[in-house]
């Protein structure tokens, strides 16, 4: 982990999570594969971009995460943990091995209609 954000996140959360590698990065957040040191399991650790965290604010972020924490549905990934450490706002979900829908579409192109319909229905149910 050579980039400054990864090093900062790793230092801020070192007592609870060991960051293994970056899984992805978008406009709002960076997602890392990490080891939950308390429960000895692989997790996906999502960290809000610092500039977004500054605008959103810790209290609002924690309120919104508390709402998300009570959602239960087979097609919604559950929340394991969340918090603020220094200026790092984060939440933790199970790490699910496999490819994303985006990766699948890049690899294979358009989905067969029946499969696209099934996926769309599952997303809508969530």
Q: Which ranges hold each PLM region?
A:
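Conserved ATP-binding/catalytic core of the eukaryotic-like protein kinase fold
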Residues: 1-126
């Amino acid at each position: 982990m050579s980039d400054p954000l990864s090093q900062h996140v790793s230092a801020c959360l070192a007592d609870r999570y060991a960051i293994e590698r970056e899984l992805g990065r978008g406009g709002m957040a960076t997602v890392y594969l990490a080891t939950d040191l308390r429960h000895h399991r692989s997790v996906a650790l999502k960290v809000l971009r610092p500039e977004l965290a500054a605008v959103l604010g810790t209290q609002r972020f924690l309120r919104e995460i508390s709402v998300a924490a009570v959602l239960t549905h087979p097609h919604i990934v559950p929340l394991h943990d969340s918090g603020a450490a220094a200026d790092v706002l984060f939440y933790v979900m199970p790490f699910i091995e496999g490819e994303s829908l985006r990766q699948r579409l890049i690899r294979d192109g358009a989905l067969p209609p029946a499969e696209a319909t099934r996926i769309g229905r599952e997303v809508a149910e969530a």
